[in-house]
């Protein structure tokens, strides 16, 4: 079993997650999760042997809203975890610059072969 990095009690979103910008409401991940909510409403109708697309439109809207709301916080948590990982990685790179030497920048002329048109 892997031990947690810090002994702080487990929280879904710590206070330092508030400093990050919120996810956009048109984020494709949120739209996908909302679509999953719509599909779950359709599957619910299918399981209960109701007309699939037309029965319980209010229920389908509730599923979409609930999934979108839960997805918003899941995306926010994912962004926070990526930010923590990036902070640790860049901190390590700053403390150990000898492990990450600067590479010489090449021009496009050095990368690509010379072009000779053939007619």
Curated annotation (Swiss-Prot):
GO cellular component, one term: respiratory chain complex I
Pfam families: NDUF_C2
Family: Belongs to the complex I NDUFC2 subunit family.
Subunit structure as annotated in this protein's UniProt entry: Complex I is composed of 45 different subunits. Interacts with TMEM242.
Function noted in UniProt: Accessory subunit of the mitochondrial membrane respiratory chain NADH dehydrogenase (Complex I), that is believed not to be involved in catalysis but required for the complex assembly. Complex I functions in the transfer of electrons from NADH to the respiratory chain. The immediate electron acceptor for the enzyme is believed to be ubiquinone.
Keyword set, alphabetical order: Disease variant, Electron transport, Membrane, Mitochondrion, Mitochondrion inner membrane, Primary mitochondrial disease, Respiratory chain, Transmembrane, Transmembrane helix, Transport
Official protein name in the record: NADH dehydrogenase [ubiquinone] 1 subunit C2
């Amino acid at each position: 079993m892997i031990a947690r990095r810090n002994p702080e009690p487990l929280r879904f979103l710590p206070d330092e997650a508030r400093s990050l910008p919120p996810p956009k409401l048109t984020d494709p991940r949120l739209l996908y999760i909302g679509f999953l909510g719509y599909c779950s409403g359709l599957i619910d109708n299918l399981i209960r042997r109701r007309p699939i697309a037309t029965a319980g439109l209010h229920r389908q809207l509730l599923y979409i809203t609930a999934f979108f709301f839960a997805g918003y916080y899941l995306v926010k948590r994912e962004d926070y975890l990526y930010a923590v990982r990036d902070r640790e990685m860049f901190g390590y790179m700053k403390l150990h610059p000898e492990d990450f030497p600067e590479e010489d920048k090449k021009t496009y002329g050095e990368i690509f072969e010379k072009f000779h048109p053939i007619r």
